[in-house]
């Protein structure tokens, strides 16, 4: 199959299996959820009644005081007592095998093509690491919410994009399912397309 180049005459021949496959919504959902789960820190921690600071002594005798019976100042009912079902650090990551991950990326790329959200260019760069230059270039291309994918990370481009809201620059190794679906448009250089095909082959 062929994809039209935005900044050059002619078209780029690409793999049908990478850019022309059916959209597998269930697979994409599973991989995106797993990716987001893996990004969770999972470091929250609370103390149970066994872990909070305090004496093990019974605060007052069982009977005769008129007060409610109490066996420990560390009871969850008490102020500064332990938490009944205390949250503990945990690993939220989910296993996704390589075949599923690659399949999800292919599904997303194919859907981007179908929705005319994938823009192929011969090259994409700025002369200097200036936000103003990149902002003008994107304005000329009528792009606002965009992910720019290049074969190799262009430092000028990366620095120019840092201060632009809804603009991100990645190299091929840095793309993931979440970033590909998070932006309205994805601009990809011809070199990046070839690298993506090799990566997902």
From Swiss-Prot:
SUPFAM superfamilies, A to Z: Ribosomal protein L4
Key words, A-Z: Repressor, Ribonucleoprotein, Ribosomal protein, RNA-binding, rRNA-binding, Transcription, Transcription regulation, Transcription termination, Translation regulation
InterPro entries: Ribosomal_uL4, Ribosomal_uL4-like, Ribosomal_uL4_dom_sf
Listed GO biological process terms: DNA-templated transcription termination; regulation of translation; translation
GO cellular component labels: ribonucleoprotein complex; ribosome
Pfam annotation, one family: Ribosomal_L4
Region described as Disordered: spans on this chain: 45-73
Single GO term (MF): rRNA binding
Highest taxon above the source species: Bacteria
Keyword Nucleotide-binding carried by entry: no
Protein family (similarity comment): Belongs to the universal ribosomal protein uL4 family.
Function: One of the primary rRNA binding proteins, this protein initially binds near the 5'-end of the 23S rRNA. It is important during the early stages of 50S assembly. It makes multiple contacts with different domains of the 23S rRNA in the assembled 50S subunit and ribosome.
Subunit structure, interactors included: Part of the 50S ribosomal subunit.
Protein name: Large ribosomal subunit protein uL4
Taxonomic source organism: Yersinia pseudotuberculosis serotype I (strain IP32953)
Lineage, top ranks: Bacteria, Pseudomonadati, Pseudomonadota, Gammaproteobacteria, Enterobacterales
Gene, per the UniProt record: rplD
């Amino acid at each position: 199959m062929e994809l039209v180049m935005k900044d050059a005459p002619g078209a780029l021949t690409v793999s049908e299996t990478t850019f022309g496959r059916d959209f597998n919504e269930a697979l994409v959902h599973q991989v995106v959820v797993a990716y987001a789960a893996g990004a969770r820190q999972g470091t929250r921690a609370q103390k149970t009644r066994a872990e909070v600071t305090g004496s093990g002594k019974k605060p007052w005798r069982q009977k005769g005081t008129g007060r409610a019976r109490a066996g420990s100042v560390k009871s969850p009912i008490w102020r500064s007592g332990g938490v009944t079902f205390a949250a503990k650090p945990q690993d939220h990551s989910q296993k996704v095998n390589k075949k599923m991950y690659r399949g999800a990326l292919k599904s997303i790329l194919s859907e981007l093509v179908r929705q005319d959200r994938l823009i192929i260019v011969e090259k994409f760069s700025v002369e200097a690491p200036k936000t103003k230059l990149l902002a003008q270039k994107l304005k000329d291309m009528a792009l606002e919410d965009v992910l720019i994918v290049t074969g190799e990370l262009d430092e000028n481009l990366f620095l120019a994009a840092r201060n632009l809201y809804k603009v991100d620059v990645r190299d091929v190794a840095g793309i993931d399912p979440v970033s590909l679906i998070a932006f309205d448009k994805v601009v990809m250089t011809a070199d990046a397309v070839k690298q993506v095909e090799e990566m997902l082959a």
